[in-house]
Amino acid sequence: MKILFDYQIFFLQRYGGISNYFFNLIKEFNKKKIVNKVYAPLYINEYINNLKLDNKFGININLNFFKINYFLNKLFFSLFIKIYKPNIIHLTYYENNNFQKKTKKYILTVYDMIHEEFSLNFKKNKTSINKLNICNRVDHIITISKNTKKKLIEF
């Protein structure tokens, strides 16, 4: 079985709880000899620099050209899926642009429901809409806590 982690959170977070969660998950997979790879062609994350070379693909960049770099990540990721042929794709955030649903299983981790609980503070932010859409498309959802699971079911 081959697991592929996408680029999203590694492109969006230099440091942070979500990227640290994935960094630790990947380290545990390595201990258990579960084949996995992070494909983040262009990333800003510092945790990913500490992964073994055979666990990652990409280069650390600065964010001067955010939109162009994000587009390139999406493009390269969809091509890499065809080359790497993972059994499972674990999405690291809530964009849902890289679906090849018929041939792969998709997993999503939901970290919290902050955007939904405090929606008045996030009026222009599309995270809630993206999260709802992606939750309806993936094969399996992991929640960080029982409380997050309860709130996700309520929304």
Stretches with model-predicted labels:
Residues 1-155:
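Carbohydrate transferase catalytic cores enriched for Leloir-type hexosyltransferases
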